[in-house]
Swiss-Prot record:
Claim: Repeat is one of the keywords in the record: yes
Superkingdom as given in the UniProt entry: Bacteria
UniProt KW keywords: GTP-binding, Nucleotide-binding, Repeat, Ribosome biogenesis
KH-like domain boundaries: 364-450
Species assigned in the record: Orientia tsutsugamushi (strain Ikeda)
All copies of domain EngA-type G, residue ranges: 4-167, 188-363
Binding annotation for GTP 2: 194-201, 241-245, 306-309
InterPro entries listed in its UniProt record: G_ENGA, GTP-bd, GTPase_Der, KH_dom-like, KH_dom-like_a/b, P-loop_NTPase, Small_GTP-bd
Pfam families, per the entry: KH_dom-like, MMR_HSR1
Name of the protein in its database record: GTPase Der
Length: 454
């Protein structure tokens, strides 16, 4: 069924993100007292009301072309242009300021077809609307408190009335399919993570072939995780751009801490994590920490080295990187980094292909019979050690208990006698035998006992 797009627009710090979270019933946008936290458009299904997509936008600030504030405003203008309904959010505490009047004029200029609702936020206490609110020129208005949920259903009633009465709204003319949340759950949740300024947002813009998220030389431009639904050769993919992750002791501002926590939350909910490394800085401890976290969460890993066009001694770089990976993260032993230049759009297709292949491996299942045939052969090629009293350790049976990632339960007579090196042997042999991508962690669970099926 077609979905209407409702854009939340206004100057910084009027409560757009709080309202966005309230309408979507999920804390998808970071809320902070510091202005300018939201820098990209964020879309979500409005769970309070059926068939609506709600859009959070950066605060409108009028600045010189090329500045961060100007680029943020361009993001807001995209939302204004594509919206069926605009919720123009103002702050009841500050009242109407000249910047609010400028915002109202901007909305009228860039979207003459849509209906606009004046949403007066932060009205925890009753207020009397003076003429400055009416001078903005919008016929529909509602007082709310996004923080406490007051007036939200009244806002919903106004939206539903506009949708049912306004004949100018034609959902079938909506062309921006990237912004709409597909009713079908995305097949693949793909998170792009890494240190600040390694090129995550540039990579996403390059594969989408549009300036979807903010980019620039400044470190830390992305603060919220930004979700974008996108189709790749029949695969419905949710791309998630994330805030860069610095070392813990380097994070001093509370807003950055919220951004980092949001990134780690994104990793936990992703299927595949593209860990992006800045080639000009090489593999650092923070990259390894991100990889280890994603592996421990059971996510599939695709390792990408960006800014490859800036490296002169390429063979030496590749050799050293392979050595560091093999030494540091055994769970993804043998992973082949993909070398790209997001800026030059070099080798991006290889990343997407590897993501799809890794996803297939990540959710792979092996029948119990085939699994036990593999186990017998693996133990025959490399027998388990003897116990102290001369009896050989035996793994009697195994079964796959889950996929995403593959998890194998093994029944044996002495768990303590199976050392880490033999566990690594089994994992590597399993991956090799069943063509599991190197970036997929495989989990082994050892249980003391007999074959439960005998």
């Amino acid at each position: 069924m077609p979905q209407a797009i409702v854009a939340l627009v206004g100057k910084p710090n009027v409560g757009k993100s709080t309202l966005f979270n309230r309408l979507s019933l999920r804390e998808k946008s970071i809320v902070h007292d510091l202005p300018g936290i939201t820098r990209d458009r964020k879309y979500a299904k409005a769970n309070l009301f059926s068939d609506l997509i709600v859009v959070d936008t950066p605060g409108l600030e009028f600045a010189a072309a090329g500045s961060l504030e100007f680029n943020m405003m361009q993001q807001s203008l995209v939302a204004i242009n594509e919206a069926h309904i605009i919720c123009f959010v103002v702050d009841a505490i500050t009242g109407i300021l000249p910047i609010d009047e400028e915002c109202a004029n901007l909305i009228r200029k860039h979207n003459k077809q849509s209906s606009t609702i004046l949403v007066i936020n932060k009205t925890e206490k009753p207020i009397i609307l003076d003429k400055s609110y009416y001078k903005l020129g919008f016929s529909e208005s509602v007082c709310i408190s996004a923080k406490h949920g007051q007036g939200i259903y009244e806002l919903g009633d106004i939206i539903q009335n506009i949708l049912s009465e306004d004949k100018k709204i034609n959902f079938l003319t909506t062309t921006n399919t990237k912004c709409e949340y597909n009713q079908q759950r995305p097949e693949l949740e793909l998170a792009i993570v890494g240190r600040p300024n390694c090129g995550k947002s540039t990579f996403i813009n390059a594969i989408l072939n549009e300036d979807r998220v903010l980019t620039g030389p400044q470190s830390g431009l992305t603060r919220n995780s930004v979700e974008i639904d996108w189709e790749y050769y029949g695969h419905l993919i949710r791309l998630v751009d994330t805030a860069g992750v610095r070392k813990k002791n380097a994070v001093t501002q509370s807003c950055e801490l919220l951004s980092v926590n949001d990134t780690f939350k994104t990793i936990r909910f992703a299927n595949i994590v593209v860990v992006m490394i800045d080639a000009t800085r090489g593999l650092e401890q923070q990259d390894l920490s991100i990889i280890s976290y994603a592996v421990n969460e059971g996510r599939g890993i695709v390792l990408v080295v960006n800014k490859w066009d800036l490296i002169k001694k390429k063979k030496e770089f590749q050799k050293e990187l392979s050595r560091l990976i093999a030494y540091s993260v055994f769970q993804i032993k043998g992973i082949n980094p993909i070398y790209i230049s997001a800026k030059e759009k070099f080798n991006l297709e290889s990343v997407l292909q590897q993501c799809v292949l890794t996803y297939a491996s990540w959710q792979k299942r092996v029948t119990t019979g085939t699994l036990n045939q593999w186990l017998a052969k693996a133990m025959s090629n490399s027998p388990l050690p003897f116990q102290s009293h001369g009896k050989r350790v035996k793994i009697k049976y195994c079964t796959q208990t889950k996929a995403r990632p593959p998890t194998i339960k093994l029944f044996c007579n002495n768990i303590e006698s199976i050392d880490e090196s033999y566990k690594r042997y089994l994992i590597n042999n399993f991956k090799l035998n069943f063509d599991i991508a190197a970036g997929v962690p495989v989990r082994l669970s050892f249980v003391k006992g007999k074959n439960p099926y005998r």
